[in-house]
Regions:
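Non-catalytic helical/linker scaffolds that mediate oligomerization, partner binding
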Residues: 1-317
Length: 317
């Protein structure tokens, strides 16, 4: 099996990366939504120094995110939030598509707001579920299709650098159909990197429904449960994960399970029983890869989390 961590402040030193590798980590993910390869040459040097064989880059793709904030915002239930001109920066296509009454999930659903006024340049919202809103956090609108390009200008720039930086795989968020995969294949070819593997992230209903058409075109499918859980009632997510796993097994395409595998270990040294059961069952379902995100990028126990992930998964093999 393959075991991935995500690089971030909690593990961005050679000693911790070596410890993660010793714990069984086979590769590492770099989230390019928070800065490109050119901005993270220090991380690339650390990854090489630690001898980590696989480097996955997670592109921006058609994902919706707010822009940068001067400082985090504390949103309180019943309060207001403006998205767009004169407020929190957000993609113009989102402002154009959203309508009165739409509910927007922010930061993987941790925060929830409802549109109370939709203008040409901004959305005024009421906060239904508050919390701390930080820069570059995700936005999802269940049931709404927002027309976004497959690859951003930053994505294309990062793909040009990918081979020279030792990238072995590219994760494409919010895959909607085979055209997204074909666009990425073409961009990799034009960058002189046709050998780099493609990981298709399933994060919305369009991706779920289109899976059969693009399965033959990808190297691995990523069942990304964060945003996928925003696209449906949470109690429907386990069934969806099982169905995606079965489809990948039937097609002979490897798949990865990711998001909140050991979320409690961001702040606790010991996982919950539910978390280790989740890992074990993902392996029984046939997962070829498992990945930690915030647990290694920002958590207090990155190495311990990787040890739990690897030991639990290997017990299931």
């Amino acid at each position: 099996m393959h075991f991935y961590g995500t690089i971030g402040p909690a593990c961005a030193d050679a000693a911790t990366l070596r410890s993660l590798k010793a714990a069984g980590m086979t590769g590492i993910r770099m989230n390019l939504s928070h800065g490109g390869l050119a901005q993270h040459t220090d991380w690339l040097d650390l990854i090489r120094e630690a001898g980590i064989p696989e480097l996955l880059i997670d592109l921006q793709g058609p994902e919706l995110r707010i822009g940068g904030l001067a400082q985090p915002l504390t949103l309180k239930a019943g309060g207001t939030l403006r998205l767009g001109q004169g407020g929190v920066p957000c993609p113009a296509p989102l402002v154009a598509a959203a309508r009165l009454g739409h509910q927007l999930l922010l930061d993987d659903g941790r925060l929830l707001v409802q549109v109370t006024a939709a203008g040409p340049d901004a959305l005024d919202c009421t906060v239904l579920r508050g919390g701390l809103l930080e820069s570059r956090k995700s936005v999802a609108v269940p049931g709404l299709t927002v027309d976004m390009p497959t690859l951003t200008a930053d994505d294309l720039e990062n793909l040009q650098m990918a081979a020279a930086c030792g990238v072995t795989g590219v994760m494409l968020p919010f895959v909607r159909g085979k055209q997204d995969i074909l666009a990425l294949r073409q961009a990799l070819a034009e960058a002189g990197a046709p050998h780099i593997r493609i990981f298709a992230k399933i994060e919305n209903l369009a991706g779920v429904q289109a899976l059969p058409e693009f399965l033959p075109l990808v190297d691995e499918v990523v069942i990304a449960r964060g945003d996928l859980g925003n696209a449906m009632p949470l109690w429907a997510l386990p069934r969806c994960q099982k169905q995606l796993s079965a489809a990948c097994r039937a097609a002979g395409v490897p798949f990865m399970v990711v998001t909140q595998m050991l979320d409690s270990m961001q702040t606790r040294a010991v996982p919950t029983r539910a978390e280790v059961s989740d890992i074990y069952n993902a392996v029984l379902d046939g997962a070829a890869s498992l990945m930690l995100t915030g647990e290694t990028a920002a958590g207090q126990y990155p190495v311990q989390a990787m040890e739990v992930l690897v030991r639990t998964a290997r017990t299931a093999l």
